[in-house]
């Protein structure tokens, strides 16, 4: 009996310890998202085509001196985990500041990557400071904290963080710290900014059995586009990596190309959240949607692929939304379910995280969209399995 009490007390202490650690990590993730939101909100020259190359060049100067600031934040964390490199929080914070300026000026990148690197770097510092044992779980918790603050969807982002690292070895026991970190990250962002949802729109959809086959066809269609997007990004990224020139010149070239695209198609600028929201409530011609799709894929590839600090998940969701509405236009039905289908398909395809993709989209858009989200996530994962947008993802 006394031994049982001791064991139970030990479990309570362990749970309390992890709640405390995860909460601290979540606070950093939420604050990172707040910082980027403030930079974007108060940047003096938002979406200025002429400033894009200049800001990209300045960001590249930092990358030349601090390599960890390069490109995708999630990829940087994955590389550090795979190679046992140390992550430092001050560099993660610097990436948040640079990415905020890049997005504000019009770079096609997401805020989730820098937020993830910031919170995961802080988590890694805690891992070393407190001499914790399971570094992988600590890093997963860091990823979840950053995603929770960025997406305002704590459950889906916690699952997404676990799947990105563990894949088929996903263990539900490891969900506890990531969920805590993700919830705290979301709460911090909400309490400071007042923004409760990623998309402040009300959507409704009545499930129809006749849509089932169309959802399957649409998921295959969006998977094909996601595959092309992954190939395009990887090719452009490797091309920039192979250039034997300073990163500031690489990012300058990327900035010039993004500026040219943005001049003709200004809708591709930024994270893509505003554009995704507009797809739900506005009508666009099929020709313009195709141009928008190509422009967003290229703008994202030239932004993050050139080494400019930023994230890939938000632009991927936007590309998925465009893919979904293009399919809807082709069949004569541009309703919201096909946009959600496209987002779930592309999100799952680019991250190889079907469960996280399905839950995240259902959490963001509502339970009415669980069917297209689930179908899209499963098919997107199967169609592009072992091919992701992240270079250092581990299988």
Curated annotation (Swiss-Prot):
Domain of life: Archaea
Gene Ontology molecular function: chloride channel activity
Major subcellular location class: membrane
Key words, A-Z: Cell membrane, Chloride, Chloride channel, Ion channel, Ion transport, Membrane, Transmembrane, Transmembrane helix, Transport
Keyword Transmembrane: yes
Compartments, as annotated in UniProt: Cell membrane
One GO cellular component, as annotated: plasma membrane
Assigned protein family: Belongs to the chloride channel (TC 2.A.49) family.
Full protein name: Uncharacterized protein MJ0305
